[in-house]
Amino acid sequence: MNARVNDLDVIKVFCAGDGRFCNPLGVVRDGRTCPDDASRQALAAELGYSETVFVDDPERGVVDIRTPGTRMAFAGHPLVGVAWLLDIEELNPPAGSVWARGDGEFTWITARPEWVTDKRTEQYASAAEVDALPAPPPGEGWLYAWAWEDEAAGRVRARGFPRRPDDAVTEDEATGSAAILLTEQLGRALNITQGAGSQILTAPAPDGMIEIGGRVRFAG
């Protein structure tokens, strides 16, 4: 492994209420252990998580987000996870400043939906149709497939498919940025069950921002 084991935390983001399910996240707390682009991308590919975060300044929340195949300016799941791990109120990924807070059970970040530029959503007639989709469905480009489970209550069933030729992730268990995009499109708070059972909460915030939250735990 490129980074020393002691420098790597693995945490579970967007857990269900009983602690099961989640999207795992690798966090390298000292980014100096992987000082260049090649070493960071190699470690992200080796770990194989949907994202790995390298912390370059823990006090200012400066972070570098990598999938197994590319660098990302913004991603929701890793920022919720690293906000919980570092216990700070502001993060600074390449996209811009992200505010964070905790309420005891959930960790929340507030972000701009226009930062989500590489994904599209597609509504299906029922949760059963979403569940029946192959992984991945035919086609190219990042797809967030969703259906109402209970529209009045804002409950959504969703699955996320990166469909990137350079990415080893066939299906993303919990996708914060796509949940932000869907919330902006629908203009309402949502309670999303994604993947095998991960839970994502969202809500519109002032000035066109979107707040997204979930439970975070250490893995193992």
Residue ranges of each PLM-predicted region?
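Active-site proximal loop and beta-alpha junction motif in alpha/beta enzyme cores
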Residues: 1-220
